[in-house]
Amino acid sequence: MPAAPDKDKALELALAQIDKQYGKGSVMRLGEEGRAPIAVIPTGAIALDVALGIGGLPRGRVIEVYGPESSGKTTVALHAVANAQRNGGIAAFIDAEHALDPDYAKKLGVDTDALLVSQPDTGEQALEIADMLVRSGALDILVIDSVAALVPRAEIEGEMGDSHVGLQARLMSQALRKMTGAMNNSGTTAIFINQLREKIGVMFGSPETTTGGKALKFYASVRLDVRRIETLKDGGEAVGNRTRVKVVKNKMAPPFKQAEFDILYGHGISREGSLIDMGVDQAILRKSGAWYTYEGDQLGQGKENARKFLRDNPDIANEIEKRIKEKLGIGAQLDAEAVEAVPAPVDF
């Protein structure tokens, strides 16, 4: 019986050949180098950043945001775009629904002059444009609004009433197979906004499902279920919505966490309101009756006054946000050696 080959030597030879053929680092041991912290794009709501477990939406990954109509899906995506741009990133918006409101986007903090926008005619065109932008390596965040509006060319060119079973699902499956690797290499975060449909004849469990087949469910690293739970009123006038987001899938941290925050009409996610809610929960802010206090200083009587105080004093708002993140350990925690080895920032 021949002698068994030296496994270590055989492995080193194989690794050397792989490095030569496919480039250095094609295969590596997981513990061999300090792992870079997960770069993230903040969502604009600290409660949602906390629920995600890493401080925001992960870079280089597929994100699905779905929910009923007018629940705040596009608002959440546009806040992520604004935060990416604020940190010097390039953003693109594939407006398949042809419903993007530039004025509203500007109010949320989006630099509409720099935002790349496409209003494609077909689903194939939309996903081809998205793929080319991702492969350029220049893009930081891409939003596709929405999956339901990615209509296959055959359906557009066909007659009303023609059956096109599975066309959109096949289109999404092929596109995600092509794009996922390129996203990871380029660090582009892709947010797919999706709509809800109801399955017919479901007796048990939820009849709700999302459009575009099952591929997006598998490829998404994070899936967010956005729901409007309450209408906010000032006097008798509706001024916004209380929104609940459930993290139904999360490959980066434990899933099934929930976040609640306010979306104000014309202003988007209330960052200050989210800071007040989280600050009280974490005992960083004190609520006594209707008064909110921070470090002995009164912020205001009632949430609206406290919100206005923080809006007028951004330094205090930033300090509260920093303390909340430190207390909850949001983002990657690095030791001294890792900091030297990996200079990449935690927040995008």
Swiss-Prot record:
<dbReference type="InterPro" id="IPR049428">
    <property type="entry name" value="RecA-like_N"/>
</dbReference>
<dbReference type="InterPro" id="IPR020588">
    <property type="entry name" value="RecA_ATP-bd"/>
</dbReference>
<dbReference type="Pfam" id="PF00154">
    <property type="entry name" value="RecA"/>
</dbReference>
<dbReference type="InterPro" id="IPR049261">
    <property type="entry name" value="RecA-like_C"/>
</dbReference>
<comment type="similarity">
    <text>Belongs to the RecA family.</text>
</comment>
<dbReference type="GO" id="GO:0006281">
    <property type="term" value="P:DNA repair"/>
</dbReference>
<keyword id="KW-0234">DNA repair</keyword>
<comment type="function">
    <text>Can catalyze the hydrolysis of ATP in the presence of single-stranded DNA, the ATP-dependent uptake of single-stranded DNA by duplex DNA, and the ATP-dependent hybridization of homologous single-stranded DNAs. It interacts with LexA causing its activation and leading to its autocatalytic cleavage.</text>
</comment>
<keyword id="KW-0238">DNA-binding</keyword>
<dbReference type="InterPro" id="IPR027417">
    <property type="entry name" value="P-loop_NTPase"/>
</dbReference>
<dbReference type="GO" id="GO:0006310">
    <property type="term" value="P:DNA recombination"/>
</dbReference>
<dbReference type="InterPro" id="IPR023400">
    <property type="entry name" value="RecA_C_sf"/>
</dbReference>
<dbReference type="GO" id="GO:0003684">
    <property type="term" value="F:damaged DNA binding"/>
</dbReference>
<dbReference type="Pfam" id="PF21096">
    <property type="entry name" value="RecA_C"/>
</dbReference>
<keyword id="KW-0233">DNA recombination</keyword>
<dbReference type="GO" id="GO:0140664">
    <property type="term" value="F:ATP-dependent DNA damage sensor activity"/>
</dbReference>
<keyword id="KW-0742">SOS response</keyword>
<dbReference type="InterPro" id="IPR003593">
    <property type="entry name" value="AAA+_ATPase"/>
</dbReference>
<keyword id="KW-0963">Cytoplasm</keyword>
<dbReference type="GO" id="GO:0003697">
    <property type="term" value="F:single-stranded DNA binding"/>
</dbReference>
<feature type="binding site">
    <location>
        <begin position="67"/>
        <end position="74"/>
    </location>
    <ligand>
        <name>ATP</name>
    </ligand>
</feature>
<dbReference type="GO" id="GO:0005829">
    <property type="term" value="C:cytosol"/>
</dbReference>
<protein>
    <recommendedName>
        <fullName>Protein RecA</fullName>
    </recommendedName>
</protein>
<keyword id="KW-0547">Nucleotide-binding</keyword>
<dbReference type="GO" id="GO:0005524">
    <property type="term" value="F:ATP binding"/>
</dbReference>
<dbReference type="InterPro" id="IPR020587">
    <property type="entry name" value="RecA_monomer-monomer_interface"/>
</dbReference>
<dbReference type="InterPro" id="IPR020584">
    <property type="entry name" value="DNA_recomb/repair_RecA_CS"/>
</dbReference>
<dbReference type="InterPro" id="IPR013765">
    <property type="entry name" value="DNA_recomb/repair_RecA"/>
</dbReference>
<dbReference type="GO" id="GO:0016887">
    <property type="term" value="F:ATP hydrolysis activity"/>
</dbReference>
<dbReference type="GO" id="GO:0009432">
    <property type="term" value="P:SOS response"/>
</dbReference>
<keyword id="KW-0067">ATP-binding</keyword>
<keyword id="KW-0227">DNA damage</keyword>
